[in-house]
């Protein structure tokens, strides 16, 4: 057991981009190592992502962000065929171990290395979901060009081009889950700081939607 201190990746947000970029690369290298591992036999992971879990995340977003936070009617959203199609598409893809919440607060920097923490939600899923968690993190608020640069670095680390359709699908799904969590924690646990993170997440979602067709 090693004390990793309190220096999360988020704590370095004010650094110059060249320095911060290297920290993100270290984090992505750790994520790729995780994704390259076989499923462990020594201890069970959480139930893998499947169509039902993806649909639950969508309902979570609808209930807490659209309904409770924005005061919108949610039935028409939840009944839209594109959501079922999104869940079915993601559930049909091969899986590997994923962190599920690899945002900047869950990456700690210690002794020049990146360490993944709070991995109790680890399960089978798509690596692109973890990548989206990192580059579209509502806390870190990376600039669009910075996110694009990190995506290019991810392709170098993984050794293969990123499938745009899969990445967009994972990013949409992750952003819905993330925004639902911000609204839920902010309103129901009294942690209003989370509500201030919603606009950045919504902006990422808006930018992804125009090209997000799964047809």
Feature roles, as predicted:
Residues 59-69, 114, 127-160, 172-190, ...:
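Active-site activation/catalytic loop segments of kinase-like enzymes and analogous catalytic loops
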Residues 24-27, 54, 76-83, 172, ...:
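Hydrophobic packing residues in well-ordered alpha-helices of helical domains and bundles
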Residues 27-31, 82, 86, 154:
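Structural preference for long, well-ordered alpha-helical segments in enzyme cores
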Residues 34, 84-131, 138-142:
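Active-site acidic catalytic loop and adjacent metal/ATP-binding pocket
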Residues 46-51, 162-171:
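All-alpha amphipathic helical-bundle segments outside canonical DNA-binding/catalytic cores
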Residues 213-215:
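Eukaryote-biased recognition of C-terminal alpha-helical segments
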Residues 79-82, 86, 189-211:
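Short secondary-structure subsegments characteristic of cysteine-rich extracellular domains
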Residues 1-56, 60, 67-70, 92:
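ATP-binding pocket architecture of kinase catalytic cores
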């Amino acid at each position: 057991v090693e004390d990793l201190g309190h220096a999360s990746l988020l704590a370095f947000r004010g650094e110059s981009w060249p320095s911060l970029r290297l920290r993100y690369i270290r984090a992505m290298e750790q994520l790729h190592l995780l994704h390259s591992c076989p499923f462990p036999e020594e201890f069970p992971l959480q139930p893998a992502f499947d169509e039902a879990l993806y649909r639950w995340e969508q309902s979570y977003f609808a209930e807490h962000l659209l309904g409770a936070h924005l005061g919108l009617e949610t039935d028409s959203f939840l009944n839209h065929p594109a959501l079922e199609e999104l869940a079915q598409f993601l559930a049909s893809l091969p899986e590997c171990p994923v962190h599920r919440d690899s945002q900047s607060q869950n990456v700690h920097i210690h002794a020049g290395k990146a360490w993944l923490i709070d991995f109790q939600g680890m399960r089978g899923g798509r690596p692109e979901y973890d990548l989206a968690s990192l580059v579209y993190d509502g806390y870190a608020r990376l600039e669009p060009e910075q996110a694009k640069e990190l995506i290019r670095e991810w392709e170098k680390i993984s050794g293969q081009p990123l499938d745009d359709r899969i990445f967009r699908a994972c990013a949409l799904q992750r952003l819905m889950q993330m925004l639902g969590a911000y609204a839920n924690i902010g309103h129901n646990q009294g942690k209003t700081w989370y509500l201030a993170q919603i606009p950045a997440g919504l902006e990422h979602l808006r930018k992804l939607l125009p090209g997000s067709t799964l047809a």
